[in-house]
């Protein structure tokens, strides 16, 4: 069973409201989540010696999350990942979004779901956040009611996303936590062993928009079906890092997505999801300029993300899994982050 405590985390400037922190604790995990962006700010996991370390990148204070920073721990929406040129059509009508990562719209726009205050509700073993995204927010059509629920069950953090729309709109929600299983202040993730359950991936153009091809991983750097040691793998294939969607083999039911093992500490993260894809990102844009928790700096490759999602730019790619949510339907996806030692 998990316990839940709440406290004030900080005040938004100009009377913007109070940001609260919710601490979820089980015998195996401790997770801190704030109501600003439904953001995971800390996640403590024990190693094989029973010593707990915080394994997510982030900040000790609210100010860190209000500055320009790479979505540490936040919920992303209305549409995670990139939409080509920030435009799409729904039922013949063209919509234009804010361009916040030239020449595309990224992670919901200038003020996405990560940059708003959510309304919390404490549950017996977790916390539920809700908000109404108004019609036209960041250029998206229709009003969207959204619920994000975090629950703790032993060594498992479960994240459920639900949404209902007043008119047809693309919806693709994820969490953008950066993990380092050696501890959040460790300089890199080179010694992490990574497995991703995907036979295919999406090649991208120079602006990181999928080309439309669904390519086999066989014989490429993207074949992560058997464990690879990340640093050596990137070196062997002369890669700058990963920032790609892997197409998962599962159905709409819960299926295995990825496993990451840090041999030195024994920590293991397994990810399961109902989503058809996962963006594996190795912190390629981190540059060491942000000051994180306990004075940590976050250089390139100091954290990895496993962003469970629909495939990027699906609203413009008819052969990708459907991303439109229509009135009367419910968006309902769950991701499980399961921690253990081995």
UniProtKB/Swiss-Prot annotation:
Q: At what positions is Phosphoserine found?
A: 14, 124
Q: Where in the cell is it found?
A: Cytoplasm
For this record, the Gene Ontology CC terms, alphabetical, are: cytoplasm; extracellular exosome
Q: Where does beta-D-galactose bind?
A: 81-82, 107, 176-178, 243, 279, 307
Q: Its catalytic activity?
A: alpha-D-galactose = beta-D-galactose; alpha-D-glucose = beta-D-glucose
Give the highest taxon in the source lineage: Eukaryota
Please provide, alphabetically and separated by semicolons, the GO molecular function terms listed in this UniProt record.
Answer: aldose 1-epimerase activity; carbohydrate binding
- Residues annotated with N-acetylalanine modification: 2
Q: What is its EC number?
A: 5.1.3.3
Q: In which pathway does it act?
A: Carbohydrate metabolism; hexose metabolism; Carbohydrate metabolism; galactose metabolism
**Catalytic residues identified in the record:** 176, 307
Q: Which UniProt keywords apply?
A: Acetylation, Carbohydrate metabolism, Cytoplasm, Disease variant, Isomerase, Phosphoprotein
Q: Name one Pfam family in it.
A: Aldose_epim
GO terms for biological process, alphabetical: carbohydrate metabolic process; galactose catabolic process via UDP-galactose, Leloir pathway; galactose metabolic process; glucose metabolic process
Main location as per UniProt? cytoplasm
Effect on the protein upon substituting residue 307 to A: Loss of activity
Physiological role: Mutarotase that catalyzes the interconversion of beta-D-galactose and alpha-D-galactose during galactose metabolism. Beta-D-galactose is metabolized in the liver into glucose 1-phosphate, the primary metabolic fuel, by the action of four enzymes that constitute the Leloir pathway: GALM, GALK1 (galactokinase), GALT (galactose-1-phosphate uridylyltransferase) and GALE (UDP-galactose-4'-epimerase). Involved in the maintenance of the equilibrium between the beta- and alpha-anomers of galactose, therefore ensuring a sufficient supply of the alpha-anomer for GALK1.
Subunit info here reads: Monomer.
| Similarity-based family | Belongs to the aldose epimerase family.
Pathological condition linked to this protein in its record: Galactosemia 4: A form of galactosemia, an inborn error of galactose metabolism typically manifesting in the neonatal period, after ingestion of galactose, with jaundice, hepatosplenomegaly, hepatocellular insufficiency, food intolerance, hypoglycemia, renal tubular dysfunction, muscle hypotonia, sepsis and cataract. GALAC4 inheritance is autosomal recessive.
Quote the PANTHER family the UniProt record gives. Answer: ALDOSE-1-EPIMERASE (PTHR10091), GALACTOSE MUTAROTASE (PTHR10091:SF0)
In Swiss-Prot or TrEMBL terms, this protein is called Galactose mutarotase
Q: Which organism is it from?
A: Homo sapiens
Lineage runs: Eukaryota, Metazoa, Chordata, Craniata, Vertebrata
């Amino acid at each position: 069973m998990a316990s839940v405590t709440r406290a004030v985390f900080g005040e938004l400037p100009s009377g913007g409201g109070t940001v609260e922190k919710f601490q979820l604790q089980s015998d195996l995990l401790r997770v801190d989540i704030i109501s600003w962006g439904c953001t995971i700010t800390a996640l403590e996991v024990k190693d094989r010696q029973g010593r707990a370390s915080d394994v997510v990148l982030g900040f000790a204070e609210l100010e860190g999350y209000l500055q320009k920073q790479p979505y540490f721990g936040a919920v992303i929406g209305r549409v995670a990942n990139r939409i080509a040129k920030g435009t799409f059509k729904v039922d013949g009508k063209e919509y234009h979004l804010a361009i916040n990562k030239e020449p595309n719209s990224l992670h919901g726009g200038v003020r996405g779901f990560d940059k708003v205050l959510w309304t919390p509700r404490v549950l017996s073993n977790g916390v539920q956040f809700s908000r109404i995204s108004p019609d036209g927010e960041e250029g998206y059509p229709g009003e969207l009611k959204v619920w994000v629920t975090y629950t703790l069950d032993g060594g498992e953090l479960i994240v459920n996303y639900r949404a209902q729309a007043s008119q047809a709109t693309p919806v693709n929600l994820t969490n953008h936590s950066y993990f380092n299983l050696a501890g959040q202040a460790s300089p890199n993730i080179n010694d992490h062993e990574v497995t991703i359950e995907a036979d295919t991936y999406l090649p991208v153009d120079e602006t990181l928009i999928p080309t439309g091809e669904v390519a086999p991983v066989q014989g490429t750097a993207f074949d992560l079906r058997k464990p690879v040691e990340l640093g050596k793998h990137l070196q062997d294939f002369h890669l700058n890092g990963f920032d790609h969607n892997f197409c998962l083999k599962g159905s709409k039911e819960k299926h295995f997505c990825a496993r990451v093992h840090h041999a030195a500490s024994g920590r293991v993260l397994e990810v399961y999801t109902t989503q058809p894809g996962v963006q594996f990102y190795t912190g390629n844009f981190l540059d060491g300029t942000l000051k994180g928790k306990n004075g940590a700096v976050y250089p390139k490759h100091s954290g990895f993300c496993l962003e469970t999602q629909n495939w990027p730019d699906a609203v413009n790619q008819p052969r990708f899994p459907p991303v439109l949510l229509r009135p009367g339907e419910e968006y309902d996806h769950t991701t499980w982050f399961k921690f253990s030692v081995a």
